[in-house]
Amino acid sequence: MFKFSNLKKIFIVAEIGVNHEGDLNVAMDLIKKADEAGVNAVKFQTYKVEKYISSTQQDRRNRAKRFQLSREQFEVLSKEAKKRKLKFFSTPLHMDDIGFLRKISDIIKISSGDLTNLELIKYAARGYQNLVISTGLGTQKEIREAVNTVFKEKPTIRKNEGLVLMHCVSAYPAPEKELNLANIKWLQ
């Protein structure tokens, strides 16, 4: 079974997200290119527009729908990654997505936007031995609460073994004065 603590070198993740723009062929090509670049994993975003965006925001729904892949397409992508010996994982934007992703991935990433969504974190912790939590925009108190939620929900998981915290600066590109790299030490 995969464990972050068993890694002997840097674990490089290709953040594909929604850069495939809803096109399975583009997503497959991005996995191929990531493999050729020597990464260890590919990461996507998984969502269903109707669970993620209010029905009162039809324009926004229509835009987001163009970037959405079906569950069947995610299964194809997961198999392609595994065939290439790459870890496949995704960021779910709804609890239903977590249930689906459990079937195709043994790692899950919680977005910094969901750092304070403790119900989502609890649900993810129940079904995964490997959680990655992004901390962008989170306060130290919020990060502590998220970590404690994971430990309480799944006492067998440990930081830097099954739980990985990612230092994230939620500004793109990030101004150098806002990088706060010293925070990485605190996260450890």
Summary of predicted features, one role per range:
Residues 1-188:
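Catalytic cores and adjacent flexible loops of soluble metabolic enzymes
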